[in-house]
From Swiss-Prot:
Protein name: Imidazole glycerol phosphate synthase subunit HisF
SUPFAM superfamilies, per database record: Ribulose-phoshate binding barrel (SSF51366)
Keyword Metal-binding: no
UniProt key word Ligase: no
Length: 252
């Protein structure tokens, strides 16, 4: 059985780690390099670094922070936030990123996924999807610009399109569950992972180690992303993995 991954996520704004609830009310909680070092020592399987200041305002790539973060890591680093050109990807990979995460730019220009995948390899391209439920239409839709703008793209269509275009991995954030710490949107995630043959990372809702056990028992996703509960030291990567082991879930 494939071993499941636990991936801390750093939302970085103006060079500082921030966290909010349902994409709002961001608070400064520290230095990304310190967090990266802590999670590396904790036994995290990977780290995701999302530069949300670039997503919001089109700032230059924070290459110095990414380089410093990557230097401290012995685990894969995925970087996302406002990546819109092949040159952006080249610079990030050259400064220590192992993978890049594309969101708004991919929805705006789907051929960018194909171009990036062909140049750098499918394994480098992760497509991040901010998914929100529309109760009137009884469906999930993709959001862009840090969860601020809704698109007409159905999530269940988009995941299949990006796989066909060359995406190597999906990062699905359930906006209704983000920061709520009440468990993952397992029914939605289960529908997604049935539609694709590439790894799916689940994000949004992990509030305690048992939520990760439930996630991996009720879906076939490859990894669980965590932010709030790890940053606030409500639990640790090791504690999550210990609960998973007790639940019979293979961990790295």
């Amino acid at each position: 059985m494939i071993k499941k991954r636990i991936i801390p996520c750093l939302d970085v704004k103006d060079g500082r780690v921030v966290k909010g609830i349902q994409f709002k009310g961001l608070r400064d909680i520290g230095n990304p390099v310190d967090f990266a070092l802590y999670y590396n020592e904790q036994g995290a399987d990977e780290l995701v670094f999302l530069d949300i200041s670039r997503t919001e305002a089109g700032h230059d790539l924070v290459l110095d922070v990414i380089s410093e973060t990557a230097e401290k890591l012995f685990i894969p680093l995925t970087v996302g936030g406002g990546i819109s050109t092949i040159d952006d990807i080249s610079q990030l990979l050259n400064h220590g990123a192992d993978k890049v995460s594309l969101n708004s730019s991919a929805l705006k220009n789907p051929s960018f996924i194909k171009e990036a995948s062909e140049k750098f390899g499918r394994q480098c391209i992760c497509i991040a999807i901010d998914s929100n439920y529309d109760s009137e239409l009884n469906d999930y839709f993709c959001y862009t610009h840090g969860g601020k703008q809704r698109t007409d793209k159905r999530v269940y269509d988009w995941v299949q399109e990006v796989e066909a275009l060359g995406a190597g991995e999906l990062l699905i954030t359930s906006m209704t569950h983000d920061g709520m710490k009440q468990g993952f949107d397992v029914s939605h995630l289960h529908e997604i992972e049935k539609l694709v043959n590439i790894p799916v990372i689940a994000s949004g809702g992990g509030g305690n180690p048992e939520h990760f056990v439930d996630l991996f028992k009720e879906t076939n996703v490859s990894a669980g992303l965590a932010a709030s509960i790890l940053h606030d030291k409500e639990t640790t990567v090791n504690q999550i993995k210990s609960s998973m082991k007790r639940g019979g879930i293979p961990v790295r």
